[in-house]
Amino acid sequence: AYTWVEQTVYVNDIPSNELERWFELESERFRRPILRLFHTELETVFEEYNISQDKDFRKTLKAMQETLTPSHPYGTQTTLGRGEDLKNPSQTNIYNFFDQYYVPNNIGVVMAGDFDPEAVVALAERYFGNWKSKPIPPFKFEKQPALSQRIQRDVYGNEAPWIEMGWRFSGAASLEAEM
């Protein structure tokens, strides 16, 4: 599994003869998550967070995001979260997040490999078909402050030097995005 910006991705490599068991397990996991190993997994994420703090790529990305999007989640936290949140997590908040965002109208299943597509669709219907959609809260954030001049941030690290440049534009649907 991994997270990045606006996605959480779970990757599984399943033999064709175990597809039904996979659908059964995944439907249970997504519909009724039980966080038994929560603290063990949290330690792994926190260690990944700590390691990432020393990586030049992460440091430069964080500096660029903070500069370009200071009042947007991209600029206020990393994809791994904030250290203080990882130190003091709330299982209630995590369950609430799952309940709000892990809903069928906000999830996609992509499969490739040696299987019968019609049989897979039937399995998806069997195990996920009665899962009810819910409204997803709109993604809201504060308007970004205007950038009226070039901003340079210097980030120092242990790797070979490089230059990273970024521009803010009107959005993915704008003409500027095609440049």
Predicted regions span which residues?
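Short, well-ordered alpha-helical packing segments
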Residues: V11, F23, S27, F46, ...
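Short amphipathic alpha-helical coiled-coil/interface segments
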Residues: L42-Y49
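Non-catalytic accessory/assembly modules
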Residues: L37-L42, K55-M64, F115, A122
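A general alpha-helix detector
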Residues: V5-E6, E24-E26, T44, N106, ...
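Non-catalytic, conformational "gating/processing" segments within enzyme and secreted inhibitor domains
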Residues: L42, Q91-Y127
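Bacterial peptidoglycan biogenesis and beta-lactam-recognition machinery
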Residues: R31-R36, D116-E118, F128-K134
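M16/insulysin-pitrilysin zinc metalloprotease superfamily fold
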Residues: N12-L42, L175-A177
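Non-catalytic beta-strand/loop surface segments
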Residues: A1-E18, I51-N106, N130-S174
